[in-house]
Regions:
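Active-site and donor-binding regions of nucleotide-sugar-utilizing enzymes
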Residues: 1-87, 192-202, 210-216, 220-223
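Structural beta-sheet core signal
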Residues: 6-7, 38, 133, 165, ...
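Donor-binding and catalytic core of enzymes assembling or modifying cell-surface/extracellular glycoconjugates
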Residues: 17-20, 143-242
Length: 325
């Protein structure tokens, strides 16, 4: 009889994408030997996934595993990766080795989801290559942010490139604008965001949920390529080997400053906020105030607009696009 497992994790959506790799790896390594369900904060990530079977934690035959990734605690000094950290933990929990799954495309879409027009098609009445742009950050967690003004400069520098700005309404996002930008902040639920990424040519963001979706969601056939363009403005908060995904342009400054000379600093905020939160005890060692008054970590300021523009241009110059696919 297959063993019944419920994987429990109540962290952020990006963490759940990494947990999904562990779930996929388990089934690929031991096909037919496990029946699995999840207890998570964002259940919609697992919709359309054939590996999910509804189970009850009250069933005595069900084992509930609280999913963690303790390898993060040694990620500055060991060659651990976020994508396989949950897998290593799950292997320890079941007492069996698990071979990591294919690195990309583990979030399936239903046939009906693939068949719908993209959100950009609804706006422009045609399909175009576009980039999903996440320029925001969590309201209480600011250390991952790039300059909001530079995001606007990026949009302005690429007038022939279409962008769709996304993000959760409860987070902090700049009000970007331009004839080449469609603003959809607060207008997508999880499945809508997945479909938006599915139909996109690329994703530009900080270290975030959309960054993980860029390679976890399959590439659309119209782009005639097996991976999605993925540019992340990362700085030096995390060790680059920990976060970087497949075919991923991960713009980091690890090793360039004393505060991230060996791995990431893992700080929470750029400067203290007036909320008495414990995150005020984890502050950037090199905060810089931009001309508009925004505080940004120096490791992020070191990444110029032109660094991102050149990568976007390189991708677009090699675009092989078939809108009818």
């Amino acid at each position: 009889m297959p063993q019944k497992l419920i994987l429990r994790n109540h962290q952020s959506p990006g963490d759940l994408v990494m947990m999904l790799y562990a779930l996929t790896s388990l089934h690929e390594t031991y096909p037919g030997e496990y029946v699995t369900d999840v207890n998570v904060t964002v259940r919609d990530l697992f919709v359309e996934n054939p590996l999910i079977t509804q189970l009850s934690e009250k069933d005595p035959d069900v084992r509930v595993i609280k999913m963690e990734y303790p390898q993060i605690n040694e990620s500055n000094s060991r060659p651990y990766r976020f994508s396989t950290a949950f897998t290593a933990y799950l292997a320890d929990q079941i007492g069996r080795p698990i071979k990591p799954a294919n690195f990309a495309g583990v979030i399936p879409l239903g046939a009906h989801e693939k068949g719908w027009y993209s959100a950009m098609h609804e706006v422009l009445q045609r399909d175009v290559p576009y980039w999903v742009l996440n320029a925001g950050h969590k309201s209480d967690f600011t250390a991952k942010t790039w300059s909001f003004a530079r995001y606007q400069e990026l949009v302005d520098a690429l007038p022939d490139v279409q962008f769709v700005q996304v993000g959760a309404k409860e987070h902090i996002h700049p009000e970007l604008h331009g004839p080449n930008l469609t603003r959809m902040v607060g207008k997508t639920d999880t499945r809508q965001l997945i479909r938006l990424v599915y139909n996109s040519f690329g994703v530009i963001s900080g270290v975030s949920f959309p960054m993980h979706l860029a390679y976890a969601v399959p590439a659309h056939p119209r782009f005639r390529r097996e991976s999605r363009a993925n540019i992340t403005i990362a700085g030096g908060r995390e060790p680059s080997h920990w976060e970087q995904g497949p075919d991923h342009h991960y713009l980091h400054t690890s090793g360039m400053l004393t505060c991230c000379a060996k791995g990431g600093c893992w700080k929470s905020r750029v400067v203290a906020m007036d909320d008495n939160d414990e995150k005020n005890n984890s502050l950037c060692e090199a905060p810089m105030m931009m001309e508009d008054g925004q505080w940004v970590p120096k490791c992020m300021v070191m990444i110029e607009v032109d660094d991102v523009v050149k990568l976007v241009r390189r991708y677009m110059d090699n675009l092989d696009y078939s809108p009818k696919s």
